Regions:
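Active-site-proximal flexible loops/turns
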Residues: 15, 27, 86-88
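Surface-exposed charge patches
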Residues: 2, 32, 119
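Enzymes and membrane/adaptor proteins characterized by extended Gly/Ser/Thr/Asp/Glu-rich
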Residues: 35-147
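Boundary/entry segment of secreted carbohydrate-active catalytic domains
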Residues: 1-25
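N-terminal glycine-rich anion-binding loops that anchor highly charged ligand groups
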Residues: 11, 25-38
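Generic detector of short alpha-helix boundary/capping microenvironments
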Residues: 7, 30, 70-71
Length: 147
């Protein structure tokens, strides 16, 4: 594991970046991006995920590639918010959106949903969930923000 003092400026900048790709496997141009620019982190979307076992294998592959090219373990991220913003397929654990959980009036439900999501993502090799988010519903016609 490398320290910041051992890194070049380009390598330090690469640690501040997260990159994603199309498809279930990283294409060659994505792997080249990691190698050339020392991209240190990965963001995954629904387009990258078939099921839990495939996601786990993908995360292991990505982790190995980034570690070999940068000397640093990456954050593998996703935004599994719940509700309409879910990245995991229906065969995996999915939770209601934040507005629906809040409507129950029980803070314990929010904790339980967060814990369940964290456990599911961790079991698949994801390190960092970019959720919850604090969306402001200032437009009632916005289809993304809602129950």
């Amino acid at each position: 594991m490398r320290t910041l003092q051992e890194m070049t400026l380009q390598e330090k900048l690469g640690q501040r970046l997260a990159a994603g790709f199309q498809g279930l496997e990283p294409p060659e141009e994505f792997l080249r991006l990691i190698k050339e620019y020392k991209v240190g982190n990965i963001i995954l979307f629904r387009r990258n995920i078939q099921d839990g076992p495939q996601l786990k294998k993908l995360c292991a592959t990505l982790r190995k590639v980034v570690e070999e090219e940068t000397g640093v373990t990456p954050f593998i991220t996703i935004d599994q918010e719940g509700g309409v913003v879910t990245r995991l397929p229906e065969s995996e654990v999915n939770i209601p959106g934040a507005m629906a959980v809040a409507a129950t009036g029980n803070p314990r439900n929010a904790y339980d949903m967060g814990l369940l999501t964290a456990q599911e993502l961790r079991s698949c090799g994801v390190d960092f969930n970019l959720a919850p988010v604090m969306d402001i519903n200032c437009n009632p016609d916005n289809p993304v923000i809602g129950v």
